[in-house]
Amino acid sequence: MQALAKHKFASGSAQKARLVADQIRGLPVDRALEILAYSPKKAAVLVKKVLESAIANAEHNEGADIDELRITTIFVDDGPTMKRIMPRAKGRADRILKRTSHITVMVSDS
């Protein structure tokens, strides 16, 4: 059985979050949680929350055994980008791009 969890509009770029997602793809969930707990990246905190949600979904909705679960699918898509203006010298302005991402984690016991 499979359980899914998503975090949409997560702050942070998808490119940076994919670095974390690539580290835990295909691992057992207990090993993945250990890796995420000691990762210094901001995206690791976001991915860990989504993974914990997927584990809770599998346990509550499907009645799965937590010790059997593995991460079968994890991917990070681009979300909408917010455009902001930063004033600069001599009346100029720079555009700031505040990127968001959509994090999806699927766990399975097979």
Curated annotation (Swiss-Prot):
PROSITE patterns tied to this protein: RIBOSOMAL_L22
GO cellular component: cytosolic large ribosomal subunit
Keywords annotated in UniProt: Ribonucleoprotein, Ribosomal protein, RNA-binding, rRNA-binding
One Gene Ontology biological process: translation
SUPFAM superfamilies referenced in this protein's UniProt entry, alphabetically: Ribosomal protein L22
Pfam families: Ribosomal_L22 (PF00237)
Protein purpose: This protein binds specifically to 23S rRNA; its binding is stimulated by other ribosomal proteins, e.g. L4, L17, and L20. It is important during the early stages of 50S assembly. It makes multiple contacts with different domains of the 23S rRNA in the assembled 50S subunit and ribosome. The globular domain of the protein is located near the polypeptide exit tunnel on the outside of the subunit, while an extended beta-hairpin is found that lines the wall of the exit tunnel in the center of the 70S ribosome.
PANTHER family according to UniProt: CHLOROPLAST 50S RIBOSOMAL PROTEIN L22-RELATED (PTHR13501), LARGE RIBOSOMAL SUBUNIT PROTEIN UL22M (PTHR13501:SF8)
NCBIfam families xref list: rplV_bact
Description of how the protein assembles with itself and partners: Part of the 50S ribosomal subunit.
Protein name according to UniProt: Large ribosomal subunit protein uL22
Organism: Pseudoalteromonas translucida (strain TAC 125)
